[in-house]
Amino acid sequence: MDYRSAGVDVEAGRAFVDRIRTSVEATHRPEVVGGLGGFGGLMRLPEGLRKPLLVSGTDGVGTKLELAQDHKSHHNVGIDLVAMCVNDVITSGAEPLFFLDYMATGALSPDAMAEVVEGIADGCRQSGCALLGGETAEMPGFYPPGRYDLAGFCVAVVEEDNLIDGRRVQAGDSILGIASSGVHSNGFSLVRKILECCAAGADTRVGPEQTPVIEALLKPTHLYGALVRTLLGANTRIHAMAHITGGGIPENLPRCLPKGLMASVDPHSWPRPELFSWLQTQGELQERDLWHTFNLGIGYCLILPEADVEGARTLCSNSGFESWVIGEVIPASEPQDGPVAGLPA
């Protein structure tokens, strides 16, 4: 009896690390010290910071992993993992520095695992952060063969004086919604249930490009870090930002607002992607459930003065993102019909 007969192939693990080395090292920033394979990743803080604040975030991809593995969308789900973490930490105005990943599997599949890590590295390159390290755990008997789970961890930095924490938000500020790529990485327990029960079939085509539903569902989550850096670099006066994840706009937009203020959103101010209408029809979903589960086409929100909206929209367009003014900040009213005025409570 040996470790391999127990289900753990150490040699395959070494070969896997060698295979991903080039992709990982391509993400490294000048501040990275050393290379892949040490007990810990090392990185200097960027030069010129006076009062740096570190911002951290950790997340996973949820049950989107189930669909991704069924349809061999390993690269895309690696991007999803980075996006779920990076899109959170940048809401404070921070610059992502490095990313760590954790991957657990029942039996190491070098091709699939390499695709995942290459997707993670792709997401890191797009976000300007280093893939500083990670852990791949082979756990036979705990996970079924061919299945894996993912978790990610990101650290970013922001000058304390430049921290975006909602304190500057005022009544009358505009809410700019930035387009999502689709469902992103939330609500997939419901999505999977709909796919199990629907009669239309997962090969149904949706949207202006007639994309197969499965392909539309597995599009990677948009990464908003480069766009936010562009906006801040142009001195856009961003007062707050929200990453629209689980709970949709009603549960995420209020998180970035100070006490005494609330958001008012016009649900007809942007076009709802056909994919969400398809999910609603096939799942016979109530409108409230739709709003409180999915992003409905808005993946990220900026709160900024009305005077800055036109310039911000131009920068969004130049960066390849559609955007819409979807509402404004108003004084909080008592009693409230819901967390966001204009949307189902």
UniProtKB/Swiss-Prot annotation:
Pfam families the record matches: AIRS (PF00586), AIRS_C (PF02769)
Listed EC numbers: 6.3.3.1
Transmembrane segments: none
This protein's pathway: Purine metabolism; IMP biosynthesis via de novo pathway; 5-amino-1-(5-phospho-D-ribosyl)imidazole from N(2)-formyl-N(1)-(5-phospho-D-ribosyl)glycinamide: step 2/2
Localization per Swiss-Prot or TrEMBL: Cytoplasm
BP terms from Gene Ontology: 'de novo' IMP biosynthetic process; adenine biosynthetic process
Catalytic activity as recorded in UniProt: 2-formamido-N(1)-(5-O-phospho-beta-D-ribosyl)acetamidine + ATP = 5-amino-1-(5-phospho-beta-D-ribosyl)imidazole + ADP + phosphate + H(+)
Domain of life of the source: Bacteria
Keywords: ATP-binding, Cytoplasm, Ligase, Nucleotide-binding, Purine biosynthesis
GO CC annotation: cytosol
InterPro entries found in the cross-reference section: PurM-like_C_dom, PurM-like_C_sf, PurM-like_N, PurM-like_N_sf, PurM_cligase
Main location class: cytoplasm
GO molecular function: ATP binding; phosphoribosylamine-glycine ligase activity; phosphoribosylformylglycinamidine cyclo-ligase activity
Enzyme class: ligase
Family recorded in the similarity comment: Belongs to the AIR synthase family.
Record HAMAP family: AIRS
Protein name (record): Phosphoribosylformylglycinamidine cyclo-ligase
